Amino acid sequence: MMRHDRNVTEIDAETRPDENLWHSGDSAVGAPPAATPAAMTDLPEDRYLNRELSWLDFNARVLALADDNSLPLLERAKFLAIFASNLDEFYMVRVAGLKRRDEMGLSVRSADGLTPRKQLALIGEHTQRIATRHARVFLDSVRPALAEEGIHIVTWADLDQAERDELSTYFTEQVFPVLTPLAVDPAHPFPFVSGLSLNLAVMVRQTEDGGQHFARVKVPNNVDRFVELAAPRAGAEGENRGVVRFLPMEELIAAFLPLLFPGMEIVEHHAFRITRNADMEVEEDRDEDLLQALERELARRRFGPPVRLEIADDMTEGMLELLLRELDVHPGDVIEVPGLLDLSSLRQIYDLDRPALKDPAFVPDTHPAFADRESPKSIFATLREGDVLVHHPYDSFSTSVQRFIQQAAADPNVLAIKQTLYRTSGDSPIVRALIEAAEAGKQAVALVEIKARFDEQANIRWARALEQAGVHVVYGLVGLKTHCKTCLVVRREGSAIRRYCHIGTGNYNSKTARLYEDVGLLTAAPDIGADLTDLFNSLTGYSRKVSYRNLLVAPHGIRTGIIERVEREIAAHRERGQGRIRLKMNALVDEQVIDSLYRASQAGVRVEVVVRGICALRPGVQGYSENIFVRSILGRFLEHSRIIHFRNINEFWIGSADMMHRNLDRRVEVLAQVKDPKLTAQLDELFESALDPSTRCWELGPDGQWTPSPQEGHTVRDHQVSLMERHRSP
């Protein structure tokens, strides 16, 4: 049931005036670089897929994992939670940006020709479908399966009297004191409802005159969402071993609403949740102190306008209309689902100590190049012998990249450590190493990107801690986010100076390095060392260098560098055939890069894309993309590496940049060429595994639909499992 469908046409109408992925970060208002008009090319107008709908398709693939009975049960619950968190961020940033464009009258059409209003309408329809499916996967599949394993998520009606008595004591002692029922009447205005909070909308009736009044009760966000009952239900000896029962907190509060409203009759109560605009605008050019400006904007973010209202499907029309009016939410922004709201809380269930219901434990191995070297100089000695390519999480981050930085901090011959920090872990060994380096008298420089979305507050804390320890902290370039993953170590060796470098695709975060798939290059190559020296000078000083020896650096060099190499691959293919371009990345959106791949396809070059998330390229269309093949791999680890290969010109590149406007135009990004044949062979093996016809994946069709592959009845291999087995083998 979608009661708000009656109003969807209001969004779709063109009468009113006319960015993230899960960390997409695109500017919500600024227009992207214009694609080459179709009239100036032999390419059709409809050659792009909509990026917003493509992102929703990505999240639908995450949901498909939750619905996969072959996966361990608690992993399926985790994917339900990831789906919910992903969708929250999408609305807080991407949908919020489209709404702002629409409200400001900026009717800039997307690359596929849609106005902001039309995109909002399509997003609402698509979201309602997948949100309903999300709820049904939980209700009809995951929750019953959990119950079969002794993990029961119950309702108040399922409880016996002993359990209700137990919860009555818990509620009175632990929950009731922190609840604040907020009435709405002439003396009490409608309360502020914070974004992503879970709430109960309550209608009460006065017993004296029968007058009805609305009140809101916020479900506390500093207690567990699921209340665990202290004892299993009575049963035969051994029958309940391992059985746990959980009651959602909102059900507990609802059961005791009479205690919150004594003397009043509870007429009805319903759960609801709103999402607010969390996209920030910091006027960097006008603010001398970026850190203070960002802190002011962070304080404002919690008061952003609502962009989504989630309700349970049993909410009455009258209650819904009241919420729409008081919260100033458009009916088309209502998402109505059966069952529980905010399934991101299922992470609490995932954290149960039930290893049999999770993926088998995986412990990363130390890279062979570092396995037998334990002295403080071992990493440097290894890199003097040759470059090393690490592939996380299969190669341990802590015994490679982290050890590289820690040994640099402890080595008396190291003179300087310069590093970019975009997202780092809560108790970061990388940050501690930089502090130790500064305290030891080394020149320690940290470029902390305090504008990393949803990590701003944490990065501000780290920036201040680093500054207090004597680390030189800079915040990058005005108007640009610094997203590159680079570290430069300067070491005195005899009478000479040698530079050691790390360039990666992932963050310097020891926790996510166990969950994210990334690659990194550790090298003592002089040309890369010189390039990183120039790069850090541009980040910390007034250097405006835009060309490098062995790097492509955005915002000036990556788009042009990639397109130029596509053209060289085309020319080489025309000369001797065998043209092939392979790309692995998180997102492919940039129209100019996409058009260059279309030209390669038209020339007969085979183009293979492995993309985790958004893909605006339309493959498999006769005349311009019949030689392009796109697939998506999702699994236990988040596929995060960015790798590009041009076969005929024999170049492999790795780095931080996806092919998106934000990466190529509004960020400092770095791609590095990997030249060592032993290392390029490793990257080639990675591509061959990902592109193997039997690899479990989704394939993108010319109609924009993603289809599971291989088809039923064919041999199926898991790319990530194969890599784990390969790294475990001697």
UniProtKB/Swiss-Prot annotation:
Post-translation changes: An intermediate of this reaction is the autophosphorylated ppk in which a phosphate is covalently linked to a histidine residue through a N-P bond.
Region (Disordered): 1-39
GO biological process: polyphosphate biosynthetic process
Reactions that this protein is recorded to catalyse: [phosphate](n) + ATP = [phosphate](n+1) + ADP
One Pfam family, short name: PP_kinase
EC number(s) given by UniProt: 2.7.4.1
GO terms assigned for molecular function: ATP binding; metal ion binding; polyphosphate kinase activity
Binding site for Mg(2+): 423, 453
Keyword Magnesium: yes
CDD domains: PLDc_PaPPK1_C1_like
GO cellular component: polyphosphate kinase complex
InterPro entries the UniProt entry points to: PP_kinase, PP_kinase_C_1, PP_kinase_middle, PP_kinase_middle_dom_sf, PPK_C_dom2, PPK_N_dom, PPK_N_dom_sf
Function (record text): Catalyzes the reversible transfer of the terminal phosphate of ATP to form a long-chain polyphosphate (polyP).
Name of the featured protein: Polyphosphate kinase
Taxonomic lineage of the native organism: Bacteria, Bacillati, Actinomycetota, Actinomycetes, Mycobacteriales
The encoding gene: ppk
